[in-house]
UniProtKB/Swiss-Prot annotation:
Enzyme class name: hydrolase
One Gene Ontology cellular component annotation held by this UniProt entry: cytoplasm
Keyword Cytoplasm: yes
Chain ranges of the CheB-type methylesterase domain: 198-392
Protein name, per record: Protein-glutamate methylesterase/protein-glutamine glutaminase
EC number per UniProt: 3.1.1.61, 3.5.1.44
Record's comment describing the protein's domains: Contains a C-terminal catalytic domain, and an N-terminal region which modulates catalytic activity.
One GO-annotated biological process of the protein: chemotaxis
Subcellular location: Cytoplasm
Alphabetized UniProt keyword annotations: Chemotaxis, Cytoplasm, Hydrolase, Phosphoprotein
Family: Belongs to the CheB family.
One Pfam family hit: Response_reg
InterPro entries on file: CheB-like, CheB_C, CheY-like_superfamily, Sig_transdc_resp-reg_Me-estase, Sig_transdc_resp-reg_receiver
Length: 392
């Protein structure tokens, strides 16, 4: 006879009595979750965490004495625990949440913006799903960004890619200005002879990720060379208002331009475009250019805005075999349908290896479906992207 599964234990840390009560009611609705206690600030939260040892913590950012960011740092240093940040939909809240994710927070949930009704119901669905996912997290990956070596654009060795060759790949892109004649070569381990590279020139790179994504994106995007001859699109599951601060923060760490995409703009090589949270990002051909189409409409029914599937499907249609799709850490299987279409049209797929994923959900769907051309740990993904782009 099977023993009943023990409920997931949770500690709630929030300075608002209303939010503590609301979160407790929400989580207590699910028989698989048990709220052990609540705390009024970061200091009390740390003390109760040490005493109760919950599996998951929900934590507000702005609190007296010790705020959420300080408490997160202490917890990750001494007792790593999956922490779900609850953040207000404000510029300050979004910026603090991005810092929390980089410091090792599991995920972010947006607090209700005003009217209880629908907002509370949406919060309940999101929070319960993320608490259950957090309980399965690879604790060893929280806050880690992967062992990556910088891919230098000033390497002494000349890679097989040249500016002349790249022009055949990027004839639909707006010029980003003058670039060096060689793409930064990939340092470190070279590919095994048995590992296949794309059959067709890569015109565009698209990356999809969810839980654990901000840290993973930092590990990958900041290691790409400044003369990358193709554009990069990113769909990261986040609450509305949170992708702009993330892109802005990463932009300061990268030799490439990283920002939110703008509806109607032409894609440029050497620029990384984030899909705005709450919207869908697709591409459309206009003459010799690829144009971003950003809006509310979605060609498929999906819970995610932005959706990796929507982005991938658009690229499969407009770019086809010139698409390099990358799926990294995240819950669920968003990206599976779109990646299948990319592969059907001759494109190439990279999936993050289980060993480095915070949550091995989205990449696992790609691997289990037999779609991945290459499965790589986080620290090697940037190198593989460069090797695929410079493939002739």
């Amino acid at each position: 006879m099977n023993q009943p599964k023990s409920p997931i234990t949770v500690l709630i840390v929030d300075d608002s009595p209303f939010m503590r009560l609301t979160l407790q009611k929400i989580l207590s609705q699910d028989p698989e979750i048990k709220v052990l206690d609540t705390a009024r600030d970061g200091k009390e939260g740390i003390e109760k965490l040490q005493a109760l040892r919950p599996q998951v913590v929900t934590m507000d950012i702005e609190m007296p004495q010790i705020d959420g960011l300080q408490a997160l740092g202490e917890i990750m240093r001494w007792q790593p625990t999956p922490i779900i940040i609850l953040s207000a939909l404000t510029t300050e809240g979004a910026q603090a949440s991005v810092k929390a994710l980089e410091a090792g927070a599991f995920d972010v949930v947006a607090k209700p913006s005003g009217g209880p009704g629908a907002d509370i119901q949406a919060l309940a669905r999101d929070l319960i799903d993320k608490v259950k996912a957090a309980a399965q997290v690879n604790l060893g990956r929280l806050g880690k960004k992967g062992a990556v070596s910088r891919i230098s654009s000033a390497s002494g060795s000349r890679p097989p890619w040249t500016a002349g060759a790249a022009s055949e790949n990027t004839n639909r892109l707006s010029s980003p200005g003058s670039t060096s004649s060689t793409l930064g070569s990939a340092k470190g381990r070279s590919l095994d002879s048995g590992e296949a590279l794309p059959k067709y020139p890569v015109e565009i790179v698209a990356i999809g990720t969810s839980t654990g994504g901000p840290s993973a994106l930092q590990a990958v995007l900041t290691q790409l060379p400044g003369n990358l001859p193709v554009p990069v699109l990113v769909a990261q599951h986040m609450p509305p208002g949170f992708t702009a601060p993330l892109a802005q923060r990463l932009n300061g760490m990268s030799p490439l331009t990283i920002r939110e995409g703008v509806h109607g703009e032409a894609l440029k090589a050497g620029t990384i475009y984030f899909a705005p949270a709450g919207k869908q990002m697709q591409v459309q051909s206009r003459g010799s250019q690829l144009i971003l189409h950003i809006g509310d409409e979605s060609p498929i029914t999906t819970l995610y805005h932005p959706s990796v599937d929507v982005m991938f499907m658009s690229l499969a249609k407009e770019v086809g075999k010139g698409t390099l799709g990358v799926v990294m850490t995240g819950m669920g299987n968003d990206g599976l349908r779109g990646m299948r279409e990319i592969k059907e049209r001759g494109g190439y797929a990279i999936a993050e290896a289980e060993e480095t994923c915070v949550v091995y959900g989205m990449p696992r769907a790609i691997v289990d479906a037999g779609l991945a051309n290459r499965v790589a740990p986080l620290g090697e993904i940037a190198r593989h992207i460069v090797e695929c782009v410079q493939r002739r």
